[in-house]
Each structure stands twice: as C-alpha cells, then as structure tokens.
Amino acid sequence: MLFSLRELVQWLGFATFEIFVHLLALLVFSVLLALRVDGLVPGLSWWNVFVPFFAADGLSTYFTTIVSVRLFQDGEKRLAVLRLFWVLTVLSLKFVFEMLLCQKLAEQTRELWFGLITSPLFILLQLLMIRACRVN
C-alpha cells in the first residue's frame, strides 16, 4: 500500500521539501554504495558513502529550526515547540543509527552488534506507530 504525499507529511511531521531532500540523499547514497561495493572508486570510505545522509540531516535540522522560529514569531508557540521536538527526535534517532552503522562497516568492531545498531530504528518505529494512531 502506497501513501499519498499528504499522508507522509502528516505522519512523519516533515515538510514536502524535507522529504524531497531525504529522497535525494537516498539516491546519491545508493550510487555511492554501488560504487563502494563494486570497488570502482578505490579511495571511497564508508564515511564518504554516508555523507549524503549526514548532509540531509543537517539541512533538515536547519530547515526545521527556521520553520519553528517563524511559527513562534507568528504566535503558534505550541505548534512550533511540538514540531521542533518531534522532528529533532526523529532526526536524532536516524543520525544515531547512521553513525553506528557507518562505524560498524568502517571498523568491523565486535562491540557493536546489529541489535544495538538497529535499536534507534525500533524506537523510531514505535514513535511513528504512536503518531499514526494520534493523527488518524
């Protein structure tokens, strides 16, 4: 089942522009991942492969800050704080997952097991389920 753009904006709490930025980052990441796995670019590290995701997170955080400040100035204080809290929580959990996965791939450490790496995603899924129930 596919979701409409309106439903995605409602459930994720991101603006359409932010979703576009993250999809563009996913496209660039996919190309870099294919280049890294095939070995076509010898000096490409895992940290360089994940740069599009890190950049998208940074741009999304910047955009969210601007939107929250504008909402706060317009008198929508409650909406501004809730939006800022929600988006920063989602981006923080996503960022922690990306950092842990990148560290595991780059260093092959035994201390990082995949249950620990994916735990931010499980927390994020629980939060999205709660938000989906609240929205509908």
From Swiss-Prot:
- The region called Interaction with STING1 is annotated at 1-51
Q: Which CDD domains does UniProt cross-reference here? A: TMEM203 (cd22816)
Q: Which GO terms are recorded in the biological process aspect for this UniProt protein? A: intracellular calcium ion homeostasis; spermatogenesis
- Protein location: Endoplasmic reticulum membrane; Endoplasmic reticulum-Golgi intermediate compartment; Lysosome membrane
Arranged from A to Z, the UniProt key words for this protein are: Endoplasmic reticulum, Lysosome, Membrane, Transmembrane, Transmembrane helix
- Work out whether the entry's keyword set contains ATP-binding: no
Cellular component aspect of the GO annotation: endoplasmic reticulum; endoplasmic reticulum membrane; endoplasmic reticulum-Golgi intermediate compartment; lysosomal membrane
Membrane-spanning ranges: 14-34, 50-72, 81-101, 112-132
Topology in membrane:
Multi-pass membrane protein
Tell me, in a sentence or two, what this protein's role is.
Answer: Involved in the regulation of cellular calcium homeotasis. Required for spermatogenesis. Acts as a regulator of STING-mediated inflammatory signaling in macrophages. Forms a complex with STING, promoting the activity of TBK1 kinase and the transcription factor IRF3, leading to activation of type I interferon expression.
Describe its partners and assembly state: Homodimer. Interacts with ATP2A2, ITPR3 and STIM1. Interacts with STING1 (via transmembrane domain).
Q: What is this protein called?
A: Transmembrane protein 203
Source organism per entry reads: Homo sapiens
- List the top taxonomic levels of the source: Eukaryota, Metazoa, Chordata, Craniata, Vertebrata
